[in-house]
Amino acid sequence: MRYGADQDLVLDLIPGAEQILHYFSKYQQADGRIKGLPGWNFSDWVYEPGWNMGVAQVGSDGGGILMDLQLLLGFQMMSDLENYQGNTFMAKKYDDKAAQLKASIQLAYWSAEKGLYAQTVEKELFSQHANSLAILAGLVEGEQARQVAEKMLTDKELAPCSVYYKFYLHEALVKAGLGNDYLNWLDIWRENIAMGLTTWGETSDVDGTRSDCHAWGASPNIEFFRTLLGIDSAAPAFAKVKIEPRLGDLKKIGGTMPHPQGSIKVNYQKNGSKLKADIELPTGVSGTLVWAGKTYQLQGGKNTIEAR
């Protein structure tokens, strides 16, 4: 919906998305949390206590945080889709479901002692996965989200995300305000390159992975544009653009990103806290540039901004 031009396709797929959420809703308990979900509930290839064939821990009450967080994110996204097609009744339905589940997750899994979300109600095991999704779902915001994000990077007791799930980890770290460190998070991809791979392995175990070509590990392909160059959609069908560069130690960088109406071209030169940004948007597309807490307006065509 946010990036593509075929909005009719999005509308056609909404009924199917509703049915999928209805399936998971059948396993919700009175407090909204999921219990007894059948099948192989794969989350990530994690080789830590309590994980089994990619499936996260289930607590003594039969529930676990990852399935609950995925359902919460599904409700939140479904509300956006319903609002987009003008169905405010259904949007409110999903908002209400999300609000109940969000409160239940907070009560069941938040560890005040650890300052993190636990895998189960026992609050003994923790993961980058759960805390990434918690940030993305808005359970923690502002300074508290930043604190959780920093712990995900430093607390070695957390089960780590594999190369595939780092997509969500990095998205959460950026949302929490740590995006300027993005280039410091790419060690596993550098290991792949050092091994001579030209595609990405299935798991973070580069020496032992069964597959040397798994597209699910290719998140830098989008994050170089969305995080580093900071180009992102700000409206359905990419009708508006928000550009918020996170350059880290880089002084100069540029790139071109495909857009339904052409392409977005950027070139940045950073000098201390100052940024010179040459930005070209497709005709008829407007947007904003965000730098150092200030917002600058962008119009279709060429824009040159001296930001500080």
Kindly label every feature range from the protein language model.
Residues 1-9, 70-88, 132-142, 168-177, ...:
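Well-ordered alpha-helical scaffold segments within catalytic/enzyme domains
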